[in-house]
């Protein structure tokens, strides 16, 4: 129970730091439009899934961003080690956040229902 609060705090800190590292340290143009939306940590803080979103919906941009993020994982871990005061930096796994697209799809469906009900 108490561990959940700690993992939530660490996840928020990791999210903030990775966003900062993306903006200030990573020079790869493939991650220019990447935004970290969430971080989920395991209870023992050994694994972190970092969810990201892109401004572009193109599949090729998504693949390029995923490749660039995977390539920069070492940089993220070393920077996190310098910035954070936890014993071990978790292993990072990047995953595209589908919730933004899902929310847009739901919004579109709801607008479609509203349009039909106006007839």
Swiss-Prot record:
GO terms for cellular component: cytosol. GO terms for biological process: maturation of SSU-rRNA. It is found in: Cytoplasm. PROSITE patterns: RBFA. InterPro entries: KH_dom-like_a/b, RbfA, RbfA_dom_sf, Ribosome-bd_factorA_CS. Monomer. Binds 30S ribosomal subunits, but not 50S ribosomal subunits or 70S ribosomes. One of several proteins that assist in the late maturation steps of the functional core of the 30S ribosomal subunit. Associates with free 30S ribosomal subunits (but not with 30S subunits that are part of 70S ribosomes or polysomes). Required for efficient processing of 16S rRNA. May interact with the 5'-terminal helix region of 16S rRNA. Pfam families: RBFA. Keywords: Cytoplasm, Ribosome biogenesis. This is Ribosome-binding factor A. It comes from Lactococcus lactis subsp. cremoris (strain MG1363). Belongs to the RbfA family. PANTHER family: RIBOSOME-BINDING FACTOR A, CHLOROPLASTIC-RELATED.
């Amino acid at each position: 129970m108490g561990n959940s609060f700690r993992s939530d705090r660490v996840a928020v800190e990791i999210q903030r730091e990775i966003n900062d590292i993306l903006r200030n340290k990573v020079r790869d143009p493939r991650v220019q439009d990447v935004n970290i939306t969430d971080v989920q940590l395991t209870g023992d803080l050994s694994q972190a899934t970092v969810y990201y979103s892109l401004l572009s919906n193109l599949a090729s941009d998504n693949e390029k961003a995923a490749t660039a993020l995977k390539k920069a994982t070492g940089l993220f871990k070393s920077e996190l080690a310098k910035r954070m005061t936890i014993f071990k930096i978790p292993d990072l796994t990047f995953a595209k956040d589908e919730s933004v697209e899902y929310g847009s799809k739901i919004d579109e469906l709801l607008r479609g229902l509203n349009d039909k009900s106006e007839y």
